[in-house]
């Protein structure tokens, strides 16, 4: 059986010149993996698959191998890849107005907020960039409600969290993680969290009985 290995030409740009590098499909993934290993801070350990393009529910790696995308961004983004309508909308907006600071209003944010609040049955919303940012803001909201409405003791607000949670990698979020790999060597951790087993209502009720500062 004869093995055909695809040759791929890559342009590498540095400060002084373009370098022309010839790679085969056999070592192309290794090339990109080694680049990340050499120049990236290793805060994550992804699968050794180097993706290059996507369409609909499918993705292809740099060697042309096809995959079903069952992860999407851990379900945070699930619109599929390169939907022509979305591509057109993104392109049109980028050609019209690319970015505005919250120091200004724009003609899209209010319409988005109206659509989202009516869709989910909320009164108001505060958009966030990431899940961890949303959790951080929820913590602030809960604490402020506790001080202004519930009248908990000053700077003593507590939040009950479940063991084995994962909500991100910011300093406060890892402070209520029970995973040593997420929080070791990052202390001192943010105080004010009470851990209980997931799914045990009696444990939650018991904490509310013991501590009047739970928000």
State what each model feature region is:
Residues 1-24:
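N-terminal mitochondrial targeting presequence
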Residues 60, 79-80, 175-176:
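Short beta-strand-to-turn element immediately C-terminal to the catalytic PLP-Schiff-base lysine
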Residues 114-215:
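PLP-dependent aspartate aminotransferase-fold enzymes
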Residues 49-71:
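Active-site and channel-lining beta-strand-loop segments
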Residues 18-55, 103:
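Active-site-adjacent loop/helix segments that line or gate small-molecule/cofactor pockets in enzymes
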Residues 58, 78-79, 194-195:
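Short, well-ordered beta-strand elements within core beta-sheets of diverse protein domains
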Residues 27, 31, 54, 81, ...:
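Conserved active-site and cofactor/substrate-binding residues in soluble primary-metabolism enzymes
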Residues 66-152:
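Glycine-rich loop-to-alpha-helix module at the N-terminal edge of alpha/beta enzyme cores
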């Amino acid at each position: 059986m004869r093995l055909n290995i695809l040759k791929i030409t890559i342009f590498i740009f540095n400060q002084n010149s373009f370098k022309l590098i010839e790679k085969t499909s056999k070592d192309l993934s290794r090339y990109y993996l080694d680049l990340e290993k050499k120049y990236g801070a290793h805060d994550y350990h992804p699968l050794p698959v180097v993706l290059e393009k996507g369409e609909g529910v499918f993705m292809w790696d740099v060697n042309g191998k096809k995959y079903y995308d069952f992860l999407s961004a851990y379900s945070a983004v699930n619109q599929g890849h390169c939907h022509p309508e979305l591509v057109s909308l993104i392109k049109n907006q980028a050609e019209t107005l690319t970015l505005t600071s919250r120091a200004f209003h724009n003609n899209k944010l209010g319409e988005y907020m109206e659509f989202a609040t009516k869709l989910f049955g909320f009164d108001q919303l505060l958009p966030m960039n990431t899940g961890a940012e949303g959790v951080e803001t929820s913590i602030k909201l809960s604490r402020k409600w506790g001080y202004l409405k519930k009248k908990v003791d000053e700077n003593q607000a507590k939040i009950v969290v479940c063991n084995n949670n994962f909500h991100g990698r910011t300093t406060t979020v890892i402070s209520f993680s029970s995973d040593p790999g997420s929080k070791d060597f990052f202390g001192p951790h943010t105080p004010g969290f009470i851990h209980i087993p997931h799914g045990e209502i009696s444990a939650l009720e018991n904490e509310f009985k013991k501590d009047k500062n739970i928000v």
